[in-house]
A protein has these predicted regions:
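Amphipathic alpha-helical transducer elements in NTP-driven molecular machines
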Residues: 32, 46-49, 62-68, 82-96, ...
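Conserved G1/Walker A P-loop phosphate-binding module
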Residues: 1-111, 127, 140, 144-145
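Conserved Switch II/interswitch segment of TRAFAC-class P-loop GTPases
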Residues: 40-45, 72-82, 93-154, 169-182, ...
Length: 365
């Protein structure tokens, strides 16, 4: 999974990136400090994997990972190539979802590229640039589909109609992700390289005092929260500066720091949970003396396709999956006891994987 961290210059996105990846991207109080996207790979915390590693004592423990990309700050006109627009748009196209960092604090010492704090305006600026880039691309798709449709190709004619409907929606200043259409048409749009169709998490970046005192009464946060609700997006209240402090601590010091702040989970943990929920992702686990590993799949994935995540041969020669729910395995204390109690099931090719399935795939090629 790849998440693109975007936002206007000086809203805190590089600070947030540093916090969650400890990558040390340069942070400066001026536009375009992040010219090339910084990339960081973050392990997904999973207590289930930790438990299995304790049980099996494998040579290697491999968590699932998320790739974060800190993408250059955007300004008006990016869709026309202004600022770093062209590079910004190509980088965002390669991501699975967008983490849109929105400034929700006043600070006269940190300049805002638009001169004032207004989260709804900031969101609109980036949304509009993505929409304008999509309009240009969709117009080309309409022309291509319409041309193919002249020969009587019904699927091309249908594509052209779908794209025309979306174009009207985009011309109203609305993003592709809010376009109402059938599941079949949605699948077509999701394979069309649209920017504004990508799922969004709004990271509402608060100052330390507001974050500590309670952000529910912050007018800026309320604006972002209400907008996210209207779009079916998610909002994550966060303080990038606090997260950066957490990221600089040793692991055993972090829990104490969080407790002092009255926070149960770090922003990174909450962001990962948000990402999995937004993209409909779950994890299954494999374990043995060589390796214990967590694998990320889309909810609804069947056993053969999950096996293919490990190796294409596993999917091609799939025979069955031997599965036990993690909670059942933990309650039993060992795989041997789980088998004695009949909790290890043999599942076929139509089995839909569940979050936390501890799995052994049987295959033959």
């Amino acid at each position: 999974m790849k998440l693109g961290i975007v936002g206007l210059p000086n809203v805190g996105k590089s600070t947030l990136f540093n916090a969650i990846t400890n990558a040390g991207a340069e942070v400066a109080n001026y536009a375009f400090c992040t010219i090339n996207p910084n990339v960081g790979v973050v392990s997904v915390p999973d207590a289930r994997l930790d438990y299995l590693a304790e049980m099996y004592q494998p040579k290697k423990k491999t968590p699932a990972v998320i790739e974060f990309v800190d993408i250059a700050g955007l300004v008006k006109g990016a869709s026309k190539g202004e600022g770093l627009g062209n590079k910004f748009l190509s980088n965002i196209r390669a991501t699975d979802a967008i983490v849109h960092v929105v400034r929700c604090f006043d600070d006269e010492n940190v300049m805002h590229v638009e001169g004032s704090t207004d989260p709804l305006r900031d969101i609109e600026i980036i949304d509009l640039e993505l929409i304008m880039a999509d309009i240009e691309m969709i117009q080309r798709r309409i022309d291509k589909a319409a041309k193919a449709g002249k020969s009587g190709d019904k699927s091309s004619l249908h594509e052209a109609d779908v794209f025309r409907g979306l174009l009207e929606h985009l011309n109203d200043g609305k993003s592709a992700r809010t376009y109402d259409c059938s599941d079949e048409d949605r699948a077509l749009l999701e394979t069309s390289d649209l920017l504004s169709i990508k799922p969004v998490i709004y990271a509402a970046n608060l100052d330390e005092n507001t974050f500590a005192a309670g952000y529910e009464d912050c007018k800026y946060y309320q604006q972002v929260r209400d907008l996210a609700a209207s779009q079916g997006a998610q909002v994550l209240p966060i303080c990038a500066k606090v997260e950066q402090e957490i990221g600089e601590l040793e692991p055993d010091e972090r829990a104490m720091f969080l407790e002092e702040l009255g926070i149960e989970e770090s922003g990174l943990d909450r962001l990962i949970q948000c990402s999995y929920s937004l993209l409909g992702l779950i994890s299954f686990l494999t374990c043995g003396s060589d390796e214990c590993r967590a694998w990320t799949i889309t909810r609804g994935t069947k056993a053969p396709q999950a096996a293919g995540k490990i190796h294409s041969d596993f999917e091609r020669g799939f025979i069955r999956a031997e599965i036990v729910a993690f909670d059942d395995l933990k309650a039993c204390g060992s795989m041997a006891v789980a088998k004695e109690k009949g909790l290890v099931r043999s599942e076929g090719k139509d089995y839909v994987m569940h979050d936390g399935d501890v799995t052994l795939f049987r295959f033959n090629v």
